[in-house]
Amino acid sequence: MDFISIEQLVSGERVDRKALEFGRGVPDPGGWPSGWTLGPQEAVAREKLKLEEEKRKKLERFNSSRLTLDNLTDLENLVQRRRKKRQRHKVPPREPESGAEPQPQVPLEPVGLEMFLKAAAENQEALIDKYLADGGDPNAHDKLHRTALHWACLKGHRQLVNKLLAAGAAIEVRDLLDRTPVFWACRGGHLDILKRLLNQGAQVNAQDKIWSTPLHVAVRMGHSDCLEHLIECGAHINAQDKEGDTALHEAVRYGHHKATKLLLLYGAKLGVKNVASQTPVQLARDWQRGIRDALQAHVGHPRTRC
């Protein structure tokens, strides 16, 4: 019969080696007596040994997995190992799904004039290509003499403009008001298309039926970038329409301060009179007087009283 001292019970030095190490039913000399039940202290000691053993095994695994970089070969091995690891975890590229956006299909039916002009306004190049491939006239127009090039310039479809010009669209084609595509580009405020047309040889000082120039149109619409480019390309800054108005008259009338400053900067004349014998300065005074009269007329009105 084995005897266990009080110190051994307290310190837990003698543990059940049969349970911890052998595990095969072989009696361990000096172990716990048969039929002996483990107490709380012995159970704690047993758990400590388990934790220490697990930590030791983890440390061994970590040390065995480390690479020493003593020479160039070790570095190459490390690089190859990392590369293989990335390849294992690399996500393969997704194949295009069958539900992806369908490509625009070329219509089988012939494209009529109305559909052709509408396609130019809506930038539907497939319809344009079909119309031109079937021998359609790129200069075809509606009852107001508006062509596909007019619409493309107004809406800002630069690629379509290039395609129509390459197909033979006339750059000086005029609508019912004698306005060329340059007018329409200025109306839409599309500087890139305006540059394309002028570089192609379009007239910068063309006049419509009321003698307005592209400069007048750019000022009326407030597109100062188009205005400045027209001036730099040789636009007549003091050109007058049928009413005798210059671009400066229009800038004052519409209250476009930036356009007014640009015109004055480039040398627009202040003393040019229109048909009503008004200079831009007088027009500004009348405009201010009209605003003042409108305000004074509503002083004390119940609807405008604070």
Curated annotation (Swiss-Prot):
Span of the signal peptide: none
Q: Which residues form a coiled coil?
A: 41-90
Identify the main location. nucleus
Keywords associated with the record: ANK repeat, Coiled coil, Nucleus, Repeat
| One cellular component (GO) term of this entry | actin cytoskeleton
Which compartments is it annotated to reside in?
Nucleus
Q: What spans are recorded as compositionally biased (Basic residues)? A: 80-91
Please verify whether the record's keywords include Coiled coil.
yes
Q: Which domain of life is it from?
A: Eukaryota
Q: Which GO terms describe its biological process?
A: fatty acid metabolic process; regulation of sarcomere organization; response to muscle stretch
What GO terms are given for molecular function? Answer: titin binding
Presence of the UniProt keyword Nucleus in the record: yes
Q: Supply the InterPro entries for this chain.
A: Ankyrin-SOCS_Box (IPR050663), Ankyrin_rpt (IPR002110), Ankyrin_rpt-contain_sf (IPR036770)
Q: Where are the ANK repeats?
A: 144-173, 177-206, 210-239, 243-272
Q: Where is this region: Disordered?
A: 78-107
User: Which residue stretches belong to region Interaction with TTN?
Assistant: 179-196
Q: How does it assemble?
A: Interacts with titin/TTN and MYPN.
Q: What does this protein do?
A: May be involved in the energy metabolism. Could be a molecular link between myofibrillar stretch-induced signaling pathways and muscle gene expression.
Protein name in the entry: Ankyrin repeat domain-containing protein 23
Q: Which organism is it from?
A: Mus musculus
